[in-house]
Structure formats: C-alpha cells, structure tokens
C-alpha cells in the first residue's frame, strides 16, 4: 500500500509530499493538482513495470513551467508483506535536444539497498542486502523493469509486485468500442477501455470473484442475471437481464453510459479493493445517479480494512460529505503556482463540506 509520495519539478508539484491512509479523498477546486497526483502515480507504475520509458512517462510538458530546473525527482514509499519499500527516481532533461533519461534510480527495503542505478550502471543487492555484480542498463527505462524473480532477489521482485498492485483508473464509458475481447490482459488500463480483456483474464482464473460481482450487481439491480463472453471473432461482453421471466442479453456497447460506469466501478472494487492492493479512482461518480453514488461509497467503506487502500477524486456532494470529515486531503493552488496541502475549511453555520465548497469556501486556483 502507498505510504507517501514526494515530488519536485513535476507540473504544479514542487517540493510536494502527500501521505496516504486506508481511505483518502482528494479535494480541491479544478486545477489544484488532484488529477496530477493520480496520473503521476500511474506514470510511475507504468515506468517501473517497463511499460513506458522516460520520454512517455515524464515528457517535457510535465516540467514545472515557472522553473528552469533540468531534473525531476520522485520518491514513493510502499508497504508490502510487512516491509517498507522506498523508490527514488531522478529524471534528467536536456532542454536543447529535447531528450531526457534516468539520472538515478534507487530501491530501499527497510532502509537497506536493493537496487542502485546511476549513469547507466546498476548494482543489485540480494535478500541479505549483499552487493551483486554491476550491470549495464538502458538510461531511458527503469532498470527494475528487467529484474525477474530469482531465489536470491525475492525482495526486489516483491517491490515490483507491490507496484503492480497499485490500480489507477479514470474510467470513461464512452467514445470507444470496448465490448470486444481479442486477448486476455491482466491489468486494466487508465481509462478502463480494455475492460473486456481483463474480464476474460479474471473469469478464467478467479471465477469466485466473478460470482461475488454478480451477487453485488443483483443487489443493486434485481433484474440483472449475469455477464458472459460470447462470439467467435473476438469475444463480446454481454449483460443478461430478466424481463418478466424472459432473459435478454445486451452487448456492453448497448447499455447506457451509466450502466457501463456502474459495472466498471463495482468490477474495480470487487476485483482490486483487496489485501495489499491500492485502488486509485479519478472522478468515478460521473454518469451514475445520486442513489447509486450513495450505495457505492457505502460499499467501499464496508470493504475497507487496514490492509487495503482507496484513493478517490470526487466533486460529488454525497462522496464529499461521506468521506471528507475523516478521510479528506484538501489541496489548494494560488495564482497557478505550486500545489499545497491546506487545512480543511471551517464553517460556523453548521454547513456540510459540500455546501461550504459550493458556496466558495475554498480558495480557487487563481
């Protein structure tokens, strides 16, 4: 699970640190940096797992505009299997040639070195923290991405597992056809556009979870029966409903945006809001009704433990009033400068947090 992240020289995040608990709701007006935090964690995850390189994960447009510093720095702290891992990364930019590369990359486990890379060379340490041979690495990629599980290096591989179990999603239930599944995929992408591919992967490896999801969806919609894949040329994800004793099926693209969003959200929570997982959702309550939002936040609260984690961004009054009093992290940004963590707004009139926000009780990103 995420403990904290430190960032410098990335968009509006300058000498910035944010700590996380089990449930976290990021709050603040548009432009204060909420989505920047979520998307940065997604970028770090993709980079560490070898899915992107420095040019894709940390493009020039991510440099802080009002500074002329050629280095970005990041520090990510995770807890996994009772060990605390710290990941440190520095990305160096050549402004003239419009290129960037890894300047330094370090992994610590309980304060001990597991991986230390600098200037294209890396040292890997075994589970007893003894130094191994020096290896050459690609300056444009994470050296950790090429580390595979070995008996002597289980801790470093556990770090990769911990990163892989950070699930980041900003679900968008429109603008693409995502009903066809041509291949299994283990990880959901940022917009959930590959939901059918991940569904295919999970239904074959963890059918018990799928049965649990069906039961949850039946409690929300008593006419829901099941979901299933069917079709020869690419399997189509179908939803089956009961209408007066007659079962009818609809492809994922045939149901409404709200129904698709509801399915994606409960799919995410049931499949990934589990032990040692961190689930990060950017504005998940778009497209769904007020009662459905209330059911969703209660469902998340009921499944929360000290072993799983959820980070949310939401402007929805129900979500704000449910989570903000105990789990809110308030962000502000003045004059389009640096993002900072602010104290919660105060009210002497007994207003809820959502009412305070709607009446301008927080500083805008001026």
Q: At which residue positions do the language-model features occur?
A:
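Catalytic acidic motif of RecA-like/P-loop NTPases
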Residues: 11, 24, 42, 256, ...
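Phosphate-binding P-loop
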Residues: 15-21, 272-274
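C-terminal lobe/lid and adjacent interdomain/linker elements of RecA-like ASCE P-loop ATPase modules
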Residues: 291-366
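Electropositive, glycine-dotted interaction segments
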Residues: 86-219, 225-228
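N-terminal pre-Walker A segment at the start of P-loop NTPase domains
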Residues: 1-14
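Phosphate-binding glycine-rich loops of NTP-binding sites
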Residues: 20-61, 262-268, 316
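Conserved ABC ATPase signature
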Residues: 31, 218, 222, 226-270, ...
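Conserved P-loop NTP-binding catalytic core
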Residues: 38-100
